[in-house]
Amino acid sequence: MRVLAIGAHPDDIEIACSGTLAKCVKRGDTVIVCHVSSGNLGHVVIPPDELRVIRANEAKKAGALAGIEVICAGFDDLEIYDNNKEARDKLVDIIKYANPDFIITHNPDDYMPDHTAVARLVFDASFTATLPNYESKYKEPAKLVPIYYMDTLAGVNFNPTEYVDITEEIDLKIEMLECHESQLVWMREHDGIDFADMVKTCSRYRGYQCGAEYAEGFRQCQVYLKGTTKRLLP
């Protein structure tokens, strides 16, 4: 299968679903990760132009650890919002390029505007990409595929309906997260937390819920034509 995970910033995917994506790669899937924005505002000291480059390199380093292709949509932080046609059209192109069998993205009820905007943009673009007469970079329309919403930060207001056992992938998940060195500093200085420890603890918590040592939780987008009778997550 082909899997597309779309996050707002570099590191969002590592936090919420990198264990699942690593497991997808292990079973033979092609996995593509897209960061819609550059993450250029996510630091206390490093200026945006410099941070943009740093975070792109951190994301590619993390993806390489698991054999994942990493691309960026090219927007900066807080430039993405849910009625932004430019952003929607860019995601249409990315979805057509990736040709996924399912998509993973943010939960629509999340803690910051870039996350909620991306959730809506992915919902809109995944349908728009299926329209043969909608003008875009790629001629062939995409398939209409299921969307899975990944966990929110610290699991706030998120009740999973599906779980993936990532016990064998937890060390890789944390290693991928730790590639984002700028964000470990940012979260410590901005939010006062040990980011890697928090993410591992949340994975442990989801594991308790489903009888695994470590797990990641998901909720499928339940709308007309996006349902499936198959288990797609690994």
Which role fits each region the language model picked out?
Residues 1-4, 82-234:
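Metal-dependent de-N-acetylase/amidase catalytic core
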Residues 1-98, 219, 231:
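Active-site rim/loop-helix segments in enzyme catalytic domains that contact anionic ligands
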